[in-house]
Structures are given as structure tokens and as C-alpha cells.
A protein has these predicted regions:
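Feature captures the catalytic ectodomains and active-site-proximal regions of enzymes
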Residues: 1-203
Length: 203
């Protein structure tokens, strides 16, 4: 997860004979963006320094080597952070605590309170989150196309709320509240989170 360790390993693997596909993942800049935000000096400095290191590595690799750089998601600075601990009227509707991600929140709602939950949630969060039933969520292929994993139904509850704004709903319980709020995060539906670069370097 350290770029200064990743690059030497890539170079070493490239020296081995034969064709190969090397996949490398680095925890940063994701970790720095979570901690300091998208407009932070810490994140921008890291990215600039990493660009220089990758450029140097690319020049030293054989001419038949192609380097592809991308990300698994973008990032969005958080401007408003909610906790469901402040909304007992929402908690009352739930079988168990919400889960998944702070910008893609899964709810397990009591069967006899589904209508009430929809009305209450949309009244409080409707301008910042898009609430869908599990069926709507899956019909819209929000998890992609192909065969559905057999555990999907166990993980996504019967309602999903997706952030369409700069807001998040913290995943907290009364036993573990007060966690530090991330300056920036992902998993919502904004352009900043969903669009990623694809950089191709070849000689």
C-alpha cells in the first residue's frame, strides 16, 4: 500500500521473462482524501509526487510495457453529516441498525412501517438522498449487470438510500457514536464520485 514499495516490486516483476499482467493497488490518495479532503495540500502534494515517481518508473521500463492508471472511485467533500441517533422517528421503523456506507445506506425496515419510513425519511432527507426499495435498486442495475450474487439480499436490506448531495449519514449505534467524520468520501451518486480518470502510458 506504499507507492515507494509498489514501484520497485513492479520493476522487479517486469524484469522476469515472458508476458505478464501486473495489478497494483495503493491506499493513497484515498486515505489522505478521507482524512484531509479533496482540496487539501496533503492530498495534492502526494498526487504530484506520485506522478513524478510513476513517470520516472515508466521511462525505465521496457518499450513494450504499457502502464494504465485509474481509480476504483472518485471523492466528494462532505458538507453535512447526519447521525440517525438524532432521529428516533427513523430508528423506530428499523429492525436493526443501518449499514453499508455513509453515502449508500442500507435499511432493514419493519414490514408494518414501510410506508411510515418512506414518508419520514423523504421528509427529512429527501432533498439530499434518493430512497429506493431493494426491488427498485436491483431493477435499476445499481450493482451492475450479470448474475446476482446469492448474498446480495442478505446485505442490502429492504431499502437503500443513495446520496445525491454533499451529505452523509453516519453508520452509528448508541454503543459506538462520536466517530470522527471523514472530510471527503465516496459511494454516492455525484459526478465527482462516479467519474474516474483512465491514464495510459506507452512508449
Amino acid at each position: 500500500d506504499n507507492i515507494d514499495e509498489i514501484i520497485p516490486n513492479i520493476e522487479m516483476l517486469c524484469e522476469n521473462p515472458g508476458e505478464k499482467f501486473i495489478l497494483a493497488y495503493c491506499d493513497n490518495p484515498d486515505g489522505l482524501l478521507h482524512k484531509f479532503g479533496t482540496d487539501s495540500t496533503e492530498a495534492s502534494t502526494y498526487i504530484k509526487e506520485t506522478e513524478q515517481k510513476i513517470e520516472k518508473m515508466s521511462k525505465e521500463l521496457d518499450e513494450d510495457t504499457i502502464v494504465i492508471i485509474s481509480a476504483d472511485h472518485g471523492h466528494r467533500n462532505i458538507e453535512k453529516s447526519y447521525t440517525l441517533l438524532d432521529y428516533p422517528e427513523i430508528q423506530e421503523c428499523l429492525i436493526l441498525p443501518a449499514s453499508l456506507e455513509s453515502r449508500t445506506v442500507a435499511f432493514w425496515v419493519k414490514e408494518d412501517m414501510k410506508k411510515v419510513f418512506e414518508e419520514r425519511f423523504n421528509k427529512i432527507f429527501g432533498e439530499e438522498f434518493w430512497l429506493m426499495t431493494k426491488e427498485e435498486f436491483l431493477q435499476k442495475n445499481m450493482l451492475g449487470f450479470g448474475k446476482k450474487h446469492p448474498k446480495v439480499d442478505d446485505f442490502i436490506g429492504n431499502y437503500i438510500a443513495l446520496s445525491t448531495s454533499s451529505s452523509m449519514i453516519r453508520i452509528e449505534t448508541f454503543l459506538a457514536d462520536g466517530k470522527p467524520v471523514k472530510k471527503s468520501t465516496h459511494c454516492g451518486l455525484t459526478k465527482e464520485e462516479m467519474e474516474v480518470p483512465v491514464i495510459v502510458i506507452k512508449k
